[in-house]
Amino acid sequence: MVKVGVNGFGRIGRLVTRAAICSGKVEIVAINDPFIDLNYMVYMFQYDSTHGKFNGTVKAENGKLVINGKPITIFQERDPTNIKWGEAGAEYVVESTGVFTTMEKAGAHLKGGAKRVIISAPSADAPMFVMGVNHEKYDNSLKIVSNASCTTNCLAPLAKVIHDNFGIVEGLMTTVHAITATQKTVDGPSGKLWRDGRGAAQNIIPASTGAAKAVGKVIPELNGKLTGMAFRVPTPNVSVVDLTCRLEKPAKYDDIKKVVKQASEGPLKGILGYTEDQVVSCDFNSNSHSSTFDAGAGIALNDNFVKLISWYDNEYGYSNRVVDLMAYMASKE
């Protein structure tokens, strides 16, 4: 089992740790966060307002974080070049601070002895992989990779199934997205993105997202055919993608349902889900799929123009894919 270090113990850092422990696919051996001391880590890992209390044991012992009896080395370095990943036994590092998202910045972890870095965010220059879509293109000459964004992980598997079966001529995506840590509790300054600084709990906030364009990087045939935007809404977790697209081959909505259901039970099992239930966002909290197609919510204008709806737990689904990507990479060593 590959040994992993986590840099940044925020929402994704903590949930990647939780997903790793719950799945047993990779082993967390080290965590670095300069802003959270050991006792605070115990508390933050144990109690989670969104996903509930951790179902296991967590304590601080001999300067280490001990989860379910396994000690994890703790670092508190601001400069990633100073983190001694190698000494802690970490072969891979999850870069989940949201700060070191380029090849150059994420590459700092290699200096401390890590063999590979997985950026848990989109990257301007690191190759992006989406499980179930293009992960098989990974080869072990790559030292730094990106797991793309939670929204790209939701959209890409659905877009792949639709494109493989019917062909997508062009499409527009909207994600209705839960609040994240980058937003403000009340109105405040927010750099160049003025709207993003408005109170998160009070507003529906139009925002930009690179998620749809990024699909073109993981499915090259769709490059230039998709774009989209986001609405940030006052819910704490779970988001939904609305993909409106023009199809090359005409298809009845029932045909679309059929191929998505088949994919969800076959090649994309565990990644793309399918439901015909009368679901709402809360029903997907702590769901580990990247994307769950909502058969009852979509609608067709005609056989070539459809709106498709797919839900995702933007925290937990994504964190599980980070773990899956690392497990896949380890299988190629």
Swiss-Prot record:
Sequence motif: [IL]-x-C-x-x-[DE] motif, positions: 243-248
Residue numbers of S-nitrosocysteine PTMs: 150, 245
UniProt-annotated location(s): Cytoplasm, Cytosol; Cytoplasm, Cytoskeleton; Nucleus
Ranges where the record places region Interaction with WARS1: 1-146
Keyword field: Acetylation, ADP-ribosylation, Apoptosis, Cytoplasm, Cytoskeleton, Glycolysis, Immunity, Innate immunity, Isopeptide bond, Methylation, NAD, Nucleus, Oxidoreductase, Phosphoprotein, S-nitrosylation, Transferase, Translation regulation, Ubl conjugation
UniProt modified residues of type ADP-ribosylcysteine: 150
Effect of residue 150 to S: Abolishes sulfhydration and induces impaired enzyme activity
Subunit-structure text: Homotetramer. Interacts with TPPP; the interaction is direct. Interacts (when S-nitrosylated) with SIAH1; leading to nuclear translocation. Interacts with RILPL1/GOSPEL, leading to prevent the interaction between GAPDH and SIAH1 and prevent nuclear translocation. Interacts with CHP1; the interaction increases the binding of CHP1 with microtubules. Associates with microtubules. Interacts with EIF1AD, USP25, PRKCI and WARS1. Interacts with phosphorylated RPL13A; inhibited by oxidatively-modified low-densitity lipoprotein (LDL(ox)). Component of the GAIT complex.
Residues modified to Phosphothreonine: 73, 151, 175, 180, 182, 209, 227, 235
Residues bearing PTM Deamidated asparagine: 7, 62, 68, 147, 153, 223, 314
Protein name stated in the entry: Glyceraldehyde-3-phosphate dehydrogenase
